[in-house]
Amino acid sequence: MKSAGEPQGADPRDERKGEAMGPKAGREEPAGMPAAHPGEKTDYDTLCRQAEELLKQEPWYVSALSNLSALIYAALPDLNWAGFYLLRDGRLTVGPFQGKPACIHIPVGRGVCGTAIGRDETLNVPDVHAFPGHIACDSASASEIVLPVHADGRAAAVLDIDSPRPNRFSAEEEAGLKRLVRVMEAGLRFPPAGGE
């Protein structure tokens, strides 16, 4: 019940001393992981060390990708989705992620994710609405970066990160994410091609 001096319709939980409201606001961060704040630079040295530790604890791809998507989502500011699509039966299938429910299947060669895995290259898209054939799983997404993840010399998955902010991913951030993917590739245990 609201007190007489409190404006009607206001939610006292919204008074978070200048904290940004949005998909990440108010959630607790895992132990040892600082919350990401808009405008803050990501410390990729620390992020890579944290990823290495998670992979040492459990390299099996389902558990590892679940924790890695949570790590990335918590560490990078201004995101609305961070997760993985796995190459399965000739198409990408959604894997572990953080954010709103996502498109389940993406054909190779379609959208940012399908194009990235089809070309086996990182795609850093400053304006997803200008990308031919963009697949909009979340209409709030404005920019996106997709990085292939390899296993046994083949592209086995993509790391997909979306932001509601246009031009979110700088060249410096792209380089940091590529370092993080190399850590993943060294520590992940994927099933053999065609296996589960």
Task: Report residues per predicted region.
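Intrinsically disordered, low-complexity terminal regulatory regions
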Residues: 2-96, 100, 179, 183-196
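A short, aliphatic-rich beta-strand micro-motif
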Residues: 143-150
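Regulatory sensory and allosteric helical modules in signal-transduction proteins
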Residues: 79, 87, 91-137
